[in-house]
């Protein structure tokens, strides 16, 4: 009888243990799920929104400096992708974009007059000229937003970074959604720029541009212990232009605002566009979105297909050493009359411009 009672107690004890173990396993599944904190939305796909840019995205081949182009065909489900990503897009106006043009006083007459006559005339309020010398005549004649940075006119790393530092601070002050930097030898195709940026949200981390190299740059990052570490990162070449969303620009502030940009540049001893890439890719770990819609004089511009020229975001032309490096676009102007081809492109985009030849007008 005693043995039977002991066996019974042992059985009850084992059943109790099994029941408790089962409860321990079931309790987490019975509790209501905890609410997760809001996570940042993913960046949109690196593609233009819709026609005409949809079919005109070009990327450089392995020889980026040579200017080779490879057309990227749109996927079959591109329209569905457009619908899925529509909530990422901004309904942009040109007034939402801060376009910074970097120049120097010696190019005021030769380059700025051409820009003010062409694309800048269509975006005067959105375009800000950053230079190193006062020019009252140009300011009054062209009605441009000219900002004298008081930086050196020398083409040195320090001078370039000084101007970029002022560009960044002025953009932050402007409260605009997008910062786009170009050089004074770029033509900005405004409709294409507007459509490209509309494919993204300005609150997201977006860094758009074209590398001048086919590989990441490697830099020696100086540290306080008198040593250095090697860092690799992509950067968008300033000669082709690049754009940064406001959301990302604000995150750059510790290394870029109020003169900190110059200090950061000295840390890696690289020019302004490289320093931008260093801050964004190496420090903030935000990847560059590579796009072939931006173009610089480093490329072979003659290889850009004529039928796609007006779909690009920026164009350029060769300097004194390579005057023939221009886009191949026909029009009423001869090469002698329009050596940069900027006037020809402008008259194709805006045929009703007063100075465009009549036969190109509607």
Swiss-Prot record:
* An annotated GO BP: Notch signaling pathway
GO CC terms of this entry:
Golgi membrane
Annotated region (Disordered) at 33-80
EC numbers, comma separated? 2.4.1.222
- Listed as disulfide-bonded, the cysteine pairs are 151-162, 180-243, 347-356
- InterPro entries linked: Fringe, Fringe-like_glycosylTrfase
> Which cofactors, if any, are listed as required?
Mn(2+)
Q: Where in the cell is it found?
A: Golgi apparatus membrane
Active site residues of this protein: 273
GO MF terms held by the record:
metal ion binding; O-fucosylpeptide 3-beta-N-acetylglucosaminyltransferase activity
**Lumenal face residues:** 33-362
Query: What are the glycosylated positions?
Result: 150
Instruction: Please tell me where substrate binds in this chain.
Output: 111, 184
**Skewed-composition ranges (Basic residues):** 44-53
Enzyme superclass (EC): transferase
- In this UniProt entry, which residues form the Cytoplasmic topological domain(s)? 1-11
* Keywords assigned by UniProt, alphabetized: Developmental protein, Differentiation, Disulfide bond, Glycoprotein, Glycosyltransferase, Golgi apparatus, Manganese, Membrane, Metal-binding, Neurogenesis, Notch signaling pathway, Signal-anchor, Transferase, Transmembrane, Transmembrane helix
What the record notes about the co-factor is:
Has some activity with cobalt but not with magnesium, calcium and zinc.
Question: Which transformation does this protein catalyse, written as a reaction?
Answer: 3-O-(alpha-L-fucosyl)-L-threonyl-[EGF-like domain protein] + UDP-N-acetyl-alpha-D-glucosamine = 3-O-(N-acetyl-beta-D-glucosaminyl-(1->3)-alpha-L-fucosyl)-L-threonyl-[EGF-like domain protein] + UDP + H(+); 3-O-(alpha-L-fucosyl)-L-seryl-[EGF-like domain protein] + UDP-N-acetyl-alpha-D-glucosamine = 3-O-(N-acetyl-beta-D-glucosaminyl-(1->3)-alpha-L-fucosyl)-L-seryl-[EGF-like domain protein] + UDP + H(+)
Q: Tell me where it mainly resides.
A: Golgi
User: What Pfam families does its record include?
Assistant: Fringe (PF02434)
Q: Which residues cross the membrane?
A: 12-32
Biological role:
Glycosyltransferase that initiates the elongation of O-linked fucose residues attached to EGF-like repeats in the extracellular domain of Notch molecules. Regulates neurogenesis in the hindbrain; involved in boundary cell specification via Notch-mediated activation of wnt1 expression.
The family classification in the record reads: Belongs to the glycosyltransferase 31 family.
What is the name of this protein? Answer: Beta-1,3-N-acetylglucosaminyltransferase radical fringe
Q: Which organism is it from?
A: Danio rerio (Zebrafish)
Annotated gene: rfng
């Amino acid at each position: 009888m005693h043995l039977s009672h002991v066996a019974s107690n042992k059985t009850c004890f084992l059943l109790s243990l099994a029941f408790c173990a089962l409860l321990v396993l079931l309790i987490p599944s019975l509790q209501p799920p905890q609410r997760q904190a809001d996570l940042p939305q993913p960046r949109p796909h690196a593609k233009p929104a819709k026609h005409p840019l949809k079919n005109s995205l070009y990327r450089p081949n392995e020889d980026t400096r040579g200017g080779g182009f490879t057309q990227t065909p749109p996927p079959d489900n591109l329209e569905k992708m457009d619908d899925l990503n529509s909530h990422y897009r901004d309904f942009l106006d040109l007034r939402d974009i801060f376009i910074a043009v970097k120049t120097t006083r010696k190019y005021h007459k030769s380059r700025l007059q051409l820009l003010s006559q062409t694309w800048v005339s269509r975006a005067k309020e959105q375009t800000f000229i950053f230079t190193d010398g006062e020019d009252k005549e140009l300011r009054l004649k062209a009605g441009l937003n000219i900002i004298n940075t008081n930086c050196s006119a020398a083409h040195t790393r320090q001078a370039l970074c000084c101007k970029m530092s002022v560009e960044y601070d002025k953009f932050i002050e402007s409260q605009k959604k997008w910062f786009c930097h170009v050089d004074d030898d770029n033509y900005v195709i405004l409709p294409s720029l507007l459509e490209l940026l509309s494919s993204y949200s300005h609150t997201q981390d977006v860094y758009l541009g074209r590398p001048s190299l086919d590989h990441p740059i490697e830099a020696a990052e100086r540290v306080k212990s008198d040593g250095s570490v090697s860092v690799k990162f992509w950067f968008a070449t300033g000669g082709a232009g690049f754009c940064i969303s406001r959301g990302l620009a604000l995150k750059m502030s510790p290394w870029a605002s109020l003169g900190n940009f110059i200090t950061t540049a000295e840390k890696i001893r690289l020019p302004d566009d490289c320093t931008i890439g260093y801050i964004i890719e190496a420090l903030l770990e935000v990847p560059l979105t590579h796009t072939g819609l931006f173009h610089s004089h480093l490329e072979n511009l003659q290889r850009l297909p004529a039928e796609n020229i007006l779909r690009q975001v920026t164009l350029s032309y060769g300097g004194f050493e390579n005057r023939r490096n221009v886009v191949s676009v026909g029009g009423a102007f001869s090469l002698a009359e329009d050596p940069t081809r900027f006037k020809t492109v402008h008259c194709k985009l805006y045929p009703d411009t007063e100075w465009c030849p009549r036969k190109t007008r509607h």
